[in-house]
Amino acid sequence: GIERDVYLWSQPKTAIQDFRVISTLDDTYKTGIFKLAIDLKNHEEKAKNLTISYELLDKNGKAIATESKNLWVSPAVNSTASFETSIPGVATWTAEIPNLYKMVMTIKDGDKTVEVVPYHVGFRRFEMKQTKELAGNGKPYTVFLVNGQPVKFKGVNIHEHNPETGHY
């Protein structure tokens, strides 16, 4: 028998197969760099001329970025629509204040909306940088930064094995 949840997934014959989002920050940590690649697959027998668009909405539902492209999608072939933009003054994501934007991707065939896919996006930048401060061995410390701010990891180093007998 079936022991876990089951659901049916249905998509149009020409639909989003996959997408990739890169949402980071520039060197000032104030301007968002947004890149989106949408892969489409056409399972129909004839080519389609589709309009692919995205809209990035803030927490109040206001569009901060939007763009659309026409794309000719051949049968049985993956086609990719790529978008890239800079967004000044974005609200950054941190663990303490996890600001997220709602991205809505839309596929249209003429005036008919074929598919709408929502996704949440946060703008943040992770880095490892060396400091000017030197450790006891004379090498500089390396610091983990989120949006240019140092993050201190607190924890322990656990090794669940015994050097003489293997696992405990």
Per-range role (PLM):
Residues G1-Y168:
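Secreted/periplasmic carbohydrate-active enzymes, especially glycoside hydrolases
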